[in-house]
Amino acid sequence: GSVNIFNYDEIVEKAGGQNNAFTSNDITNYYITLPKENLEQAFRLESDRMLGLAFTPKSLEVQRQVVVEEFKQNYLNQPYGDIHLLLRSLAYKKHPYQWPTIGKEVSHIENATMDEVKSFFYKHYAPNNAILVVAGDVELDQVKHLSEKWFGSIVRRESHIRNIPTEPQQTK
């Protein structure tokens, strides 16, 4: 939730929609599926998330537990689940892809601090570092209008150049 919207999921569900998110090494993808009549609701919710994500000890602990359970489900609780963790460090020696998005071990998640989470959010979550995709039976002019209305006033954040090291050629 955010400082303004505590019941994000409930609002989406009442509008006839659903939402979720996933991460990869290169992106975090938040998505909402709603009837077109409620399109503006999605813009309002996402701009509010970008403007005022709620950073509370409770929200951090809830998300920490969710991610720990995802880690266990994906890597520890299934046969050969840890193979992806093991292969990364074999395939990549310098590139950030050597590190799993979710952390290399449960302690990485458990020990994440509020300051680290805030720093990451404020470094990466801004309209100038986001891609908005709207699909369905909607008009382009409406999407442009809603984009400007809900995201236009959000302050750009400093762009960060990712200095990704060149991965040495693999010989084995």
Briefly describe each language-model feature range.
Residues 2, 33-64:
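M16/insulysin-pitrilysin zinc metalloprotease superfamily fold
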Residues 13, 54-72, 139, 158-171:
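Acidic/histidine-enriched alpha-helical segments
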Residues 1, 12, 30, 46, ...:
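Buried hydrophobic packing residues in well-ordered domains
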Residues 89-130, 158-166:
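Histidine-acidic residue clusters that define the catalytic metal-binding segment
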Residues 58-65, 78-86, 138, 145:
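Non-catalytic accessory/assembly modules
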Residues 7, 12-14, 24-27, 82, ...:
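Short, solvent-exposed loop/turn segments at the edges of secondary structure
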Residues 1-33, 99-103:
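M16/MPP (pitrilysin/insulinase) zinc-metallopeptidase core fold and M16-derived inactive scaffolds
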Residues 94, 98, 131-172:
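An aromatic/glycine/proline-enriched structural segment found at the starts
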